[in-house]
Amino acid sequence: MAECVVHDWQGKEAGKASLELKVSKETTAVDLMHRAVLRQQAHSRQGTASTLTRAEVRGGGRKPYKQKGTGRARQGTIRTPLRPGGGIIFGPKPRTYNLAMNRKERRLALRTALMARIEDVIVVKDFGNSLKVPKTREISDALIRLGLAADAKVLIILSTPSEIIRRSVRNLEKVKLIAADQLNVFDLLHANSLVLSEEALAKIQEVYGDD
């Protein structure tokens, strides 16, 4: 079980919170998280790259020059892969890049990644509840009050982000906002710091704490 300090919106300490999740063994943790990240990145690929072979290129019914008498190598079509405008040899075709990974492994990788970053977790009480209108400056000032550098990559995890907070965060280049049910290994490992609301922490414990 790990304990986190809870801060209020002004950055002052307001209590403690705990998180208890089962994680992978040290000997397999890195490999497990690596496979989870590879799977996530592979699933984000569209796989729509496509080229034409010499059989599919339009035209190509005539020879570029006569068979004999030129001193050059013989060629039978203007759509050979050796000529500009010709087909592509072994070019890409639409395909799926999806990688298989068991559900238990995926959930274990997620729990392991989160617990590996527990020292970088900052829990905030009533995150952004005082905002009445979207205001980017309020979010950036709050992150500074929490001790985060202005150029730090921050992942904010909320239970159900409001539209006001979404619009306040979207103009901050280094800050990413996700809901607790959008938790993923890549974002957890990519960020320098993780900012969670109390509700998001409780939801994560509820969803992943029973495994």
Swiss-Prot record:
Primary role: One of the primary rRNA binding proteins, this protein initially binds near the 5'-end of the 23S rRNA. It is important during the early stages of 50S assembly. It makes multiple contacts with different domains of the 23S rRNA in the assembled 50S subunit and ribosome. Forms part of the polypeptide exit tunnel.
Using the UniProt annotation, give all residue ranges assigned to the region (Disordered): 41-78
UniProt record similarity statement: Belongs to the universal ribosomal protein uL4 family.
Q: Where is the composition biased (Basic residues)?
A: 60-71
A GO CC annotation recorded here is: ribosome
Gene behind the chain: rplD
- Gene Ontology biological process terms in this record: translation
Specify residue ranges for compositional bias: Polar residues: 41-53
Name of the protein in its database record? Large ribosomal subunit protein uL4
- Output the HAMAP family linked to this UniProt entry: Ribosomal_uL4_B
Q: Which UniProt keywords are present, listed alphabetically?
A: Ribonucleoprotein, Ribosomal protein, RNA-binding, rRNA-binding
InterPro entries reported in the protein's UniProt record: Ribosomal_uL4, Ribosomal_uL4-like, Ribosomal_uL4_dom_sf
Naturally occurring in which organism (per UniProt): Prochlorococcus marinus (strain MIT 9313)
Pfam families (alphabetical):
Ribosomal_L4 (PF00573)
Self-association and partners: Part of the 50S ribosomal subunit.
Please list the GO terms describing molecular function: rRNA binding; structural constituent of ribosome
Top-down, what is the taxonomic lineage of the species of origin? Bacteria, Bacillati, Cyanobacteriota, Cyanophyceae, Synechococcales
